[in-house]
């Protein structure tokens, strides 16, 4: 069950935070010759995520935000894209795996393997993979990429 407070907090952090950040940056970006906004979404926005409805809903909304901003800001020379990380190594996914394993009554290692088995490449993404893609999109090499939602997930098909 999802409380109204949980819903509002997730929307405020995940969606509104990116909107307000972008809106504050736009006046400065309009003065740049290489302006780019990279929104961070998630593959959960495209696939859905059981028991994480507020999270998945806001990540889907970020995809729409990025696409709409790309259309609106393109004439000013500002590129906008969304990155959709999959299962990213680190403390956050470790907690998700641990909590889920406890709920299901299985070991952490068994639950982690279930997550990894959902990825075609059979490995998690690391934060540097996401950072590298963001740097590419912000670089001159990414000058003609806008309005795109780019998955960095090793081909996750279900969460």
Range-by-range predicted roles:
Residues 46-47, 123, 134-135, 146-159:
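Short C-terminal tail/terminal secondary-structure segment
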Residues 3-11, 115-116:
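Substrate-binding pocket helix/loop in short-chain dehydrogenase/reductase
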Residues 22, 58, 66:
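Active-site helix of classical SDR
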Residues 2, 48-56, 68, 96:
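Active-site loop-to-helix junction immediately N-terminal to the catalytic Tyr of the SDR YXXXK motif
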Residues 42:
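Residue(s) in the substrate-gating loop at a strand-loop-helix junction
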Residues 74, 79, 145-147:
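Short, small/polar-rich loop/turn modules that mediate ligand/substrate recognition or access, typified
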């Amino acid at each position: 069950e999802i409380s109204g407070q949980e819903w509002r907090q997730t929307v405020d952090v995940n969606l509104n935070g990116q909107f307000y950040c972008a809106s504050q940056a736009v006046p400065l970006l309009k003065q740049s010759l290489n302006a780019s906004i990279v929104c961070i979404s998630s593959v959960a926005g495209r696939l859905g995520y059981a028991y994480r409805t507020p999270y998945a809903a806001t990540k889907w909304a970020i995809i729409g935000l990025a696409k709409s901003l790309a259309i609106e800001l393109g004439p000013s020379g500002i590129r906008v894209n969304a990155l959709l990380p999959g299962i990213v190594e680190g403390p956050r996914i470790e907690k998700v795996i641990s909590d889920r394993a406890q709920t299901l009554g299985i070991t952490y290692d068994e639950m982690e393997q279930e997550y990894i088995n959902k990825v075609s490449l059979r490995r998690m993404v690391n934060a540097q993979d996401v950072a590298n893609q963001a740097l590419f999109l912000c670089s001159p090499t990414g000058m003609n990429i806008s309005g795109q939602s780019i998955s960095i997930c090793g081909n996750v098909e279900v969460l």
